[in-house]
Amino acid sequence: WSPLLFRVMEGITGYLLPGGIFVIVILVLSVMHLNHLFIWMDPEVVEHDKIIKAKSGYLDSTFFLIRAVFYLSGWVIYRYVSRRLSIAQDNSKDNKNHVKNFKLSAAFLVFFLVTESMMSWDWIMSIDPHWFSTLFGWYVFASMVVSAVTTIALISIYLKSIGYLPNVNSNHLHL
């Protein structure tokens, strides 16, 4: 059922590059101390806090930004390559592009599971560096999946209602 909804999913992820740039700007402003989003970026706080000091190898401003750029670059590059292969498949007589995209997506899933967990530690859990959870990344991932399926369904229902997805039926949307 998903090929009919590929363009919907690709459209939804179209925000990734501008959204990623926005996130990087916020994180750079945090590192420059132009906001106080992450308390562990304040040297005075770190000096008097044993827990934050113990995490200073991981909670390092430069390493933090490098990780953020790594996560977002990987996600944006995957989105770009996957979309390019998807469009190429539309104009192809064989399924080589589909097979490439399938293999790429399987590899990306592993990359995403790891980087999404680390992203949740970096951007959410480190707001309060005294709190930690080994399961938090999985909770965030589960929330992302539910949000993604809901968003795909709502946008697909809307697009079908205005005539853009005539081949989509209740079987595709599990209604």
Task: Go through the PLM ranges and name each one.
Residues 55-175:
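Long, contiguous internal "core" modules enriched in hydrophobic/ aromatic residues
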Residues 1-91, 108:
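Transmembrane-helix bundle segments that line or gate the permeation/cavity pathway
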